Amino acid sequence: MPQHRDPHEQAQVALVLFHVGPYRAALEARHVLAMTDHPTALRTANAQSLLYAGSDPESPPSRWLTLRDAQTVSDNGGTWQLGVSGDFTLQQLPANTLYPLPKLLFPRRFSTALCGFTFDQQQLVLLLDARKLSP
């Protein structure tokens, strides 16, 4: 028997939220394969250095997100790890609260991975496209 959804029920998007310098950022959880305290992949990158070219990280990464390498077209699907400072959280946010980057800001963005924004507990969260991140 098919299940019927409540028309008032909003679609949710699972996000992994973390800090990058003074900002909070998020990746869609479907792109995060694992979350660990120590790097285990051959290829790693610090989120702050990766997103802010020429910026020295305030502190070394304390957590690691394992991501599928979008640049690698191998059968085994290579992975790499993104180092973040502080804790990360897995949260479900309503899809209608995720906003694309406005056209005027798009050419001025600091990273090609920046694709939108949302708010969590009245704090701005930068939405990143994991497929555009690479070490």
Go through each PLM region and give its residues.
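An acidic, low-aromatic, low-complexity terminal/linker signal
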Residues: 1-135
